[in-house]
Amino acid sequence: MIYGVGTDIIQIDRVRGVMERTRGRFVEKILGPREMKIYLARKARSEKRGLAFLCTRFAAKEAFSKAIGLGMRWPMTWRAMELLNQPSGEPAPHCTGELAEWVRERGLTVRVSVSDEHEYAVAFAIAERGGQLAAPQSEPASN
C-alpha cells in the first residue's frame, strides 16, 4: 500500500555555488559517512562527477523526506538517511538512529530513483507500508 511519494529536482550550478561559498563544508552537512567515501572517490576522478553525486544525494534526501511525510524535520536529518547502491547498482536508502526506528515502527519500505544530466539532478521516492526491501550491503558498491 502506498504511504507517500516525493520528488525533488535541483540545479547543479546552484549547489556548485553553495560549495564555493562554504568552501566545501556543505558536503559535510549533507552526506553520511559511507556516502562521503563514495563522493571523495568520485571527486578524485572527476570534479564534475563528484558534484553530480552530491546533487543526486541531496535530491534523494529531499524526495525521501517528502515520501515519508516528514519533510526535513526530526527525526529526518540530512545524514540520518544515506542512499547507497546495491551490488546490482540499484540505489537503496539506509536509515540510521531515530529515523531508522521511526521508519521501522511504521512498517515502511522506501524506494528511491535518482538521475542527473548536465544542469539538473532529480530524485523520486515512493514509500510503501509493508513489504520487504533488502538492506544495502555494509560496504556499498563504489560505482
Curated annotation (Swiss-Prot):
<keyword id="KW-0808">Transferase</keyword>
<keyword id="KW-0460">Magnesium</keyword>
<dbReference type="InterPro" id="IPR037143">
    <property type="entry name" value="4-PPantetheinyl_Trfase_dom_sf"/>
</dbReference>
<keyword id="KW-0276">Fatty acid metabolism</keyword>
<keyword id="KW-0479">Metal-binding</keyword>
<dbReference type="GO" id="GO:0006633">
    <property type="term" value="P:fatty acid biosynthetic process"/>
</dbReference>
<feature type="binding site">
    <location>
        <position position="8"/>
    </location>
    <ligand>
        <name>Mg(2+)</name>
    </ligand>
</feature>
<keyword id="KW-0963">Cytoplasm</keyword>
<dbReference type="GO" id="GO:0005737">
    <property type="term" value="C:cytoplasm"/>
</dbReference>
<dbReference type="GO" id="GO:0000287">
    <property type="term" value="F:magnesium ion binding"/>
</dbReference>
<keyword id="KW-0444">Lipid biosynthesis</keyword>
<feature type="binding site">
    <location>
        <position position="62"/>
    </location>
    <ligand>
        <name>Mg(2+)</name>
    </ligand>
</feature>
<keyword id="KW-0275">Fatty acid biosynthesis</keyword>
<dbReference type="InterPro" id="IPR002582">
    <property type="entry name" value="ACPS"/>
</dbReference>
<dbReference type="InterPro" id="IPR004568">
    <property type="entry name" value="Ppantetheine-prot_Trfase_dom"/>
</dbReference>
<keyword id="KW-0443">Lipid metabolism</keyword>
<comment type="similarity">
    <text>Belongs to the P-Pant transferase superfamily. AcpS family.</text>
</comment>
<dbReference type="Pfam" id="PF01648">
    <property type="entry name" value="ACPS"/>
</dbReference>
<protein>
    <recommendedName>
        <fullName>Holo-[acyl-carrier-protein] synthase</fullName>
        <ecNumber>2.7.8.7</ecNumber>
    </recommendedName>
</protein>
<dbReference type="InterPro" id="IPR008278">
    <property type="entry name" value="4-PPantetheinyl_Trfase_dom"/>
</dbReference>
<dbReference type="GO" id="GO:0008897">
    <property type="term" value="F:holo-[acyl-carrier-protein] synthase activity"/>
</dbReference>
<comment type="function">
    <text>Transfers the 4'-phosphopantetheine moiety from coenzyme A to a Ser of acyl-carrier-protein.</text>
</comment>
